[in-house]
Amino acid sequence: MHNELKQGYENIITAVGEDPNREGLLDTPKRAAKAMEYLTQGYRQTLEEITNNAVFTSDADDMVLVQDIELYSMCEHHLLPFTGRCHIAYIPNGKVLGLSKFARIVDMFARRFQIQEQLTHQIAKAVEEVTGATGVGVIVEAKHMCMMMRGVEKQNSSMRTSVMLGNFRADPKTRNEFLQLIKG
């Protein structure tokens, strides 16, 4: 994969009229290929690998919230970055997930070519699958470079998406508790 990506970046540099052998660009295809491999490593990870058996038996049955998980992803339409934060809440049903695993779940799905709507859904379904929670709520807030750097060039715009599963969808009180908690 690395050599194919490297060649692709050399082609892009040439196509825009630059010299890939110019001093400042000489190692750029190699560096860009390495960066792209990292930014898309979510395709080569599984939920089982990243959660690594960090699901623990627990009597906890009240809402658990992990807030402000930073994320970096690539829009599938323009291959430009979007950055933001994710808030995840769930109601345990006999099992809790190790805290760092929430960030790993976010990263696994964010490190793919994505749209924010799908990313939010994938995170929620993964938390539900791993924990067996009676409810999951996920909110993602992000700024999209495809809207800020090109097109309409709106630098202050942001997008917010949410997915509510189980109790978070069925019970307005649960959903409102989640929304109030993330407001601080």
Swiss-Prot record:
- One of the GO biological process terms: tetrahydrobiopterin biosynthetic process
Asked if the record carries the keyword Metal-binding, the reply is: yes
* PROSITE patterns linked: GTP_CYCLOHYDROL_1_1
Q: Which Gene3D superfamilies match?
A: 1.10.286.10, 3.30.1130.10
Give, as one word, the top-level EC class: hydrolase
What catalytic reaction does the record list? GTP + H2O = 7,8-dihydroneopterin 3'-triphosphate + formate + H(+)
What keywords is this UniProt entry annotated with? GTP-binding, Hydrolase, Metal-binding, Nucleotide-binding, One-carbon metabolism, Zinc
**InterPro entries given in the database record:** GTP-CH-I_C/QueF (IPR043133), GTP-CH-I_N (IPR043134), GTP_CycHdrlase_I (IPR001474), GTP_CycHdrlase_I_CS (IPR018234), GTP_CycHdrlase_I_dom (IPR020602)
User: Per the record, what is one GO cellular component?
Assistant: cytoplasm
This entry's Enzyme Commission designation comes to 3.5.4.16
Stored Pfam families: GTP_cyclohydroI
State the Gene Ontology terms under molecular function.
GTP binding; GTP cyclohydrolase I activity; zinc ion binding
Q: In which pathway does this enzyme or protein participate?
A: Cofactor biosynthesis; 7,8-dihydroneopterin triphosphate biosynthesis; 7,8-dihydroneopterin triphosphate from GTP: step 1/1
Positions of Zn(2+) binding: 75, 78, 146
Reading the lineage from the top rank, the first entry is Bacteria
Protein family according to the UniProt entry: Belongs to the GTP cyclohydrolase I family.
Under the subunit heading, UniProt states: Toroid-shaped homodecamer, composed of two pentamers of five dimers.
* HAMAP family xrefs: FolE
- The protein depicted here goes by the name GTP cyclohydrolase 1
Q: Which organism is it from?
A: Pseudoalteromonas translucida (strain TAC 125)
Q: What is the lineage of its organism?
A: Bacteria, Pseudomonadati, Pseudomonadota, Gammaproteobacteria, Alteromonadales
Q: From the UniProt record, report the name of the gene that encodes this protein.
A: folE
